[in-house]
């Protein structure tokens, strides 16, 4: 995928870039693999805002992605199309299995229409194949990695991300995550070979506020622009400082406070925290 630039015939067009969508081979999604995606506006079932700055945006259909692939072990599938998915930064690939079923998976970099992919312990460690980590060679690059066997992929699902297999010990495989963290993952967890495609996504510049609204993002209001009743930074005549350590609307320090629970059960699996600590 390449990034498309524009002539600056308006101020917002000067910096704006978009994806050129040249790698896509199908425009309409597979109807049987889509479900409605109702808007919440950031509200819960009581109508109260639980996630601020969410609302509006273009209507979307959710594409059902197969993040497990376990039940299709040793059933080959041909890549029928590479498609756009508005719900994620990565592209998705439509698979046609030899038993007649169709499914979506995340499209790794380099996957093309007509290629055959497979899954299961007997699958070869090649691009697009999903297999348990114990069968993935050390040094290989993977994505869509499970944290718990059978739960489905949770790690490295965004465009351009990947995880490297660093080593193996007993029932665990040591992985280097995109954050730099070294972590043990159970060897029965599935992973897909390759890097997630559409790596140029990070270079896209929205260019104008309205384009952010199309994505369902509302303006992020500063606390210092509010009244004291609304935020700890609010109030004062003219522009005034917070007068305290910067905090969230609920008083929690906002700059560098550690929020991870102490003695969390998964700490035993983390060898090196992100940032090399």
Swiss-Prot record:
One of its GO terms (molecular function) is structural constituent of ribosome. It comes from the Bacteria. InterPro entries: NA-bd_OB-fold (IPR012340), Rib_uL2_dom2 (IPR014722), Ribosomal_uL2 (IPR002171), Ribosomal_uL2_bac/org-type (IPR005880), Ribosomal_uL2_C (IPR022669), Ribosomal_uL2_CS (IPR022671), Ribosomal_uL2_dom3 (IPR014726), Ribosomal_uL2_RNA-bd_dom (IPR022666). Residues 215-263 are annotated as: Disordered. Keywords: Ribonucleoprotein, Ribosomal protein, RNA-binding, rRNA-binding. GO terms for cellular component: large ribosomal subunit. Pfam families: Ribosomal_L2, Ribosomal_L2_C. GO terms for biological process: cytoplasmic translation. Belongs to the universal ribosomal protein uL2 family. One of the primary rRNA binding proteins. Required for association of the 30S and 50S subunits to form the 70S ribosome, for tRNA binding and peptide bond formation. It has been suggested to have peptidyltransferase activity; this is somewhat controversial. Makes several contacts with the 16S rRNA in the 70S ribosome. Part of the 50S ribosomal subunit. Forms a bridge to the 30S subunit in the 70S ribosome. This is Large ribosomal subunit protein uL2. The lineage of its organism: Bacteria, Thermotogati, Deinococcota, Deinococci, Deinococcales.
